Amino acid sequence: MASGILLNVKEEVTCPICLELLTEPLSLPCGHSFCQACITANHKESMLYKEEERSCPVCRISYQPENIQPNRHVANIVEKLREVKLSPEEGQKVDHCARHGEKLLLFCQEDSKVICWLCERSQEHRGHHTFLMEEVAQEYHVKLQTALEMLRQKQQEAEKLEADIREEKASWKIQIDYDKTNVSADFEQLREILDWEESNELQNLEKEEEDILKSLTKSETEMVQQTQYMRELISDLEHRLQGSMMELLQGVDGIIKRVENMTLKKPKTFHKNQRRVFRAPDLKGMLDMFRELTDVRRYWVDVTLAPNNISHAVIAEDKRQVSYQNPQIMYQAPGSSFGSLTNFNYCTGVLGSQSITSRKLTNFNYCTGVLGSQSITSGKHYWEVDVSKKSAWILGVCAGFQPDATYNIEQNENYQPKYGYWVIGLQEGDKYSVFQDSSSHTPFAPFIVPLSVIICPDRVGVFVDYEACTVSFFNITNHGFLIYKFSQCSFSKPVFPYLNPRKCTVPMTLCSPSS
């Protein structure tokens, strides 16, 4: 109720020109009041249009400027009214214009704001399109709802983009950290390679220096002796020529024969163009080998040897080591001497605890192969064998088999893929070979192909990819250099690791994954 009275009072003290509360109010003789600035501006406008009489902007009654009087009473009311504010509770009941105190019932489309009827008539909104709030509220409610849904959709997209960029950021950090680790590891490997190559090359040069200088020193000594001998001979001849006739002829034939028969011994020389030229190692190739070896080593399995009853293939208690023991020491056929065993044939293969033994004791050819106890029927498998200091060995994989009455055991010594053997070997200390299927030239024996091995391996890695049907051999001593790879292997049955120490008593050892 009080707010209604205040609003009515406010209407009475509002300037009809600016529609604001009166400022320094002046009253005309007709009783209407105006702001001093507003009525002065109206007076100047009349002078501009050369109007002889001034009239009230509201009632158009003429007045003279000297009749305008300050309205102190209205000024006091305005001052008090400016100090009065509606209570919060009353303000919540009715929305009123902050400028005019009128109800906010209209909407200005151009300015997109709610106004009162006095605002609509003011200079600020003159000529604008205005509507009752009820007329446009539903339309704008729909628009705002559509905008809200669109914004929520964009918010979801923004959140997804934010999550994606965070995920990408994390992925990049992981990848870069991984690459940094790999780079450090690769360069560490390169440093190891360079250190090893440098040490090896320096050792070769030192050996070359030792051998050549030793030979040249020997030649130098011989040349010194030869020169000294010639000096002595020349001195003898000069003495004879300068001496008496008796000295000249005494033993003259002997000394002439010594001169005529003397052959000048030439020293042994070494041509520099025949020297081995040092070439920097192929670091990229070595690094690729390292990476391949690192990859296959992820499939390292702990292989042990199957128990067997082969007396000359001795397996250690830990089932990791097999060595050859001369059967002449352990076996003597009834009525025979050890010497008569040299032509016996004794060939044995082992699968688990089962052994296959040829009873034919003629043309004695020792076959001491043993199998690992773990069968391979799928997947990828890798293991390493220590063959250091051995002068002969055979290793690889062998297909499991069960002998029958028709099985020709002599074929067991034919290390051929068609018989289930994918193996490589060493003989005579430095001759490496791969055993292939027999050819027309060797119909009953494996076709042995020499392998070029620059650095003799102390340890050999074996990798079997059952699904890819491949068996690969790596020279661990030479940075994982690939020695040989069998492709298109016909794995029709389980295969087993195969080790044969041959006639070398130095053991072969299966390395543990932690070694």
From Swiss-Prot:
Gene Ontology molecular function: pattern recognition receptor activity; ubiquitin-protein transferase activity; zinc ion binding
Catalytic activity: S-ubiquitinyl-[E2 ubiquitin-conjugating enzyme]-L-cysteine + [acceptor protein]-L-lysine = [E2 ubiquitin-conjugating enzyme]-L-cysteine + N(6)-ubiquitinyl-[acceptor protein]-L-lysine
Top EC class of this enzyme: transferase
GO cellular component: nucleus; P-body
Binding site for Zn(2+): 97, 100, 119, 125
Compartmental location: Cytoplasm; Nucleus
Zn finger limits (B box-type): 92-133
Coiled-coil region list: 137-225
Phosphoserine PTM sites in chain numbering: 87
Keywords tagged on the record: Acetylation, Antiviral defense, Autophagy, Coiled coil, Cytoplasm, Immunity, Innate immunity, Metal-binding, Nucleus, Phosphoprotein, Transferase, Ubl conjugation, Ubl conjugation pathway, Zinc, Zinc-finger
One Pfam family here: zf-RING_UBOX
Occurrences of domain B30.2/SPRY (ranges): 283-515
EC number(s) given by UniProt: 2.3.2.27
Alphabetical list of SUPFAM superfamilies matching this protein: B-box zinc-binding domain, Concanavalin A-like lectins/glucanases, RING/U-box
Reported modifications of this chain: Degraded in a proteasome-independent fashion in the absence of viral infection but in a proteasome-dependent fashion following exposure to restriction sensitive virus.
Pathway: Protein modification; protein ubiquitination
Zinc finger (RING-type): 15-60
Protein purpose: Capsid-specific restriction factor that prevents infection from non-host-adapted retroviruses. Blocks viral replication early in the life cycle, after viral entry but before reverse transcription. In addition to acting as a capsid-specific restriction factor, also acts as a pattern recognition receptor that activates innate immune signaling in response to the retroviral capsid lattice.
Subunit structure: Can form homodimers and homotrimers. In addition to lower-order dimerization, also exhibits a higher-order multimerization and both low- and high-order multimerizations are essential for its restriction activity. Interacts with BTBD1 and BTBD2. Interacts with PSMC4, PSMC5, PSMD7 and HSPA8/HSC70. Interacts (via B30.2/SPRY domain) with HSPA1A/B. Interacts with PSMC2, MAP3K7/TAK1, TAB2 and TAB3. Interacts with SQSTM1. Interacts with TRIM6 and TRIM34. Interacts with ULK1 (phosphorylated form), GABARAP, GABARAPL1, GABARAPL2, MAP1LC3A, MAP1LC3C and BECN1.
Family per record: Belongs to the TRIM/RBCC family.
PANTHER family on file: E3 UBIQUITIN-PROTEIN LIGASE TRIM
Notes on the domains: The B box-type zinc finger domain and the coiled-coil domain contribute to the higher and low order multimerization respectively which is essential for restriction activity. The coiled coil domain is important for higher order multimerization by promoting the initial dimerization.
Designated name of the protein: Tripartite motif-containing protein 5
Naturally occurring in which organism (per UniProt): Chlorocebus aethiops
